């Protein structure tokens, strides 16, 4: 199986600008390629894992990645289908860019990676040059046909967001001309921007050897967006989402989804994935595929040490049937792996659920209590006025809050 065929088998290729040329380039040559990450937030999410896996697979094949962090495009914002993006300040955009670059460097550790920030060149273009030299080369009708733009026409789209496509096209041209990048990689939602970049290179350089690939949008089996838990977006930054929450998310992936996730989100070889697929069909209760998926992802985005902490946390939470069975050393680890709220005073359960992010609001917290889904250790709490005090603690310090079977948090006095 060729490298291109492996990418197809892994469901990592949705669109190709020229399949014959892309296949030849990836299978028989060494190519410099780029993938962009806009710093719209302070952290990557697990939704970025599709692109990261693709980068790692390309590296393993000997191809050379250029990672573009969009310090400039992050100031503009790629058009959303539903609403106008809130503009970031220059300071926030550059801070986010630095944070995301740091995360990517940790994930792509010991790999040959070149990092660039498009603020370096896009900030140097004055408005007259932008309109005369580049705006002239973009057809409005073509831009209006792009999916995200077309979706927004009825409600309205600003010229700022409308111009995003031109800026991303300029990125591809700059990297093609100055860094010898021939291939752009992006999600399927970026396909319109990728093809616009190819067209700009053709017009400015009179060449047609630049190429583009898009990866599919990864959805859960119910059609919802991949990478969100009950609490919201799963961030790579451990201070924004605990590694244990990500561990739990992937450990509970359904049998319908797990094999596709193994293909698209890990570097596990084909034969091993096929064996895991067979085991899932014959012995689904063992959940070997889910365990392999979880272990690979936590090790990739965090570390093998953090993986062991997550495994140990799971053992502690699911092996202690009674409050008295916990040991004090268990809580030393739980403070590292669960979301914790520290307090010196009694706290209403409703407030504690919000503070520990087990509920998004007091009204939601009350609904959870009414539905009998809230426990202190393993005792169900049914009173809306219940207050957590030192009397509820273990070792005069710790209270374990549970919502349902899988969501846990810690109150520390």
UniProtKB/Swiss-Prot annotation:
Cellular component, GO, one term = cytosol
Protein family per UniProt: Belongs to the class-I aminoacyl-tRNA synthetase family. TyrS type 1 subfamily.
Enzyme Commission numbers on file = 6.1.1.1
Q: Which GO terms describe its molecular function?
A: ATP binding; RNA binding; tyrosine-tRNA ligase activity
Where it sits in the cell: the answer is: Cytoplasm
Q: Note the Pfam families from the entry.
A: SYY_C-terminal, tRNA-synt_1b
A GO BP annotation = tyrosyl-tRNA aminoacylation
Q: Which CDD domains match?
A: TyrRS_core
Protein's name according to its UniProt entry: Tyrosine--tRNA ligase
Where do we find the motif 'HIGH' region here? 39-48
> Residues that bind L-tyrosine, according to the entry?
34, 164, 168
Q: Does the keyword ATP-binding apply?
A: yes
Q: Which InterPro entries match?
A: aa-tRNA-synth_Ic (IPR002305), Rossmann-like_a/b/a_fold (IPR014729), S4_RNA-bd_sf (IPR036986), SYY-like_C (IPR054608), Tyr-tRNA-ligase (IPR002307), Tyr-tRNA-ligase_bac-type (IPR024088), Tyr-tRNA-ligase_bac_1 (IPR024107)
